[in-house]
Amino acid sequence: MNSLVALVLLGQIIGSTLSFQLGPNMDCNTKGTKDWADIGVRYINEHKLDGYKNALNIIKIFRLLPSDGRSVIVHFKLNLLETKCHVLDPTPVENCAVRQQHNHAVEMDCNVRIIHDIATFEDEVFVKCKSTPDSVENVRRNCPKCPILLPPNDPHVVDSVEYVLNKHNEKLSGHVYEVLEISRGQHKYEPEAFYVEFAIVEVNCTAQEARDGHHQCHPYTAGEDHIAFCRATVFRSHASLEKPKDENFESDCVILDVKEGHAHSHLIQQHIEKYSTSPGHNSTDEYVVECPVAFVEKEVPTDMSDHDTPPVKGCPGRVLHFQL
């Protein structure tokens, strides 16, 4: 569970109208510094390919870099915490609950550079992040019986998701859903069970066509209540090697108001091949977020590290939630 995932983001936010103050009294706790950090957090959440939105936790470092006089360049390091809102959830991140430590929290450390054009108020944003869950040892030290995070591709997690989805489809008339992404899986104790969170999408198949395996089902586009996010608990033994057949379970699926053309519509396109498992806690590979076509030719700065420019005073800033 100490595996890391690197997330590299590149792009641009147009039309920033915030009035930024870069005075001698700035530190990592001032409103002006947080305004800059909020731009970075918003950009990360809008371009994150899978998993969950992240909330600001700590501004670790904030630097004002030398510029040509036509722009303001800032570089800062952020610590973020995973929320309970999936990236497809339209809820503003400010209204999303941060996943607490007893629920096996996940943090993300990010290097952010923003180039603010003084004349046009346009912001060019470069972000590189690394995500890692809290260690199993820490979770068990503080809460011995709390559920432990599992890889989304763990067989018990996958079987539980498919079992719940089949039960969900059996209750529907004229609608068939398939898994869009497995986002989270946890092993629970007393009673033993598997807790899963996953996104589903409606497809243009009948129930029989979806079962026979010979018909290629295509997901509907976003909008019109075609995408939902589910949370479920399947009560079964970890020692069980068979797929669940008649297990007790609890589930809740909520329709997401995802508009067509949403930034995360790529998930639907990926589904045409096969549903994905979020790599957020299990992969050690870097992956590059697909950028809007208008910005695809821009290059990620090779130097996203610390600079000779000293950071502002009062850093790191205060912890907004908790520190892992």
From Swiss-Prot:
Going by the UniProt annotation, this protein carries glycans at: N204, N282
Report if keyword DNA repair is assigned. no
**Covalent S-S links between cysteines:** C28-C315, C85-C96, C110-C129, C143-C146, C205-C217, C230-C253
For this protein, the record's PROSITE patterns field holds: CYSTATIN_FETUIN_A (PS51529), FETUIN_2 (PS01255)
Q: Which residues form a coiled coil?
A: none
Q: Signal peptide span per the entry?
A: 1-19
What is the annotated tissue distribution of the protein whose record heads this document? Expressed by the liver.
Question: What are the record keywords, sorted?
Answer: Disulfide bond, Glycoprotein, Metalloenzyme inhibitor, Metalloprotease inhibitor, Protease inhibitor, Repeat, Secreted, Signal
Which InterPro entries does the entry mention? Cystatin_dom, Cystatin_Fetuin_A, Cystatin_sf, Kininogen_Fetuin_HRG, Prot_inh_fetuin_CS
MF terms (GO), sorted A to Z: cysteine-type endopeptidase inhibitor activity
Which residues bear the site annotation Cleavage? Answer: R140, R141
Q: Which domain of life is it from?
A: Eukaryota
Q: Where is the Cystatin fetuin-A-type domain?
A: 21-130, 141-254
Q: Which Gene3D superfamilies match?
A: 3.10.450.10
What is this protein's function?
Potent inhibitor of hemorrhagic activity but also proteolytic activities. Inhibition occurs by formation of a non-covalent complex between this protein and the proteinases at their metalloproteinase domains.
What's the family? Belongs to the fetuin family.
Q: How does it assemble?
A: Homodimer.
Name-wise, this protein is: Antihemorrhagic factor cHLP-A
> Species name for this entry?
Gloydius brevicauda (Korean slamosa snake)
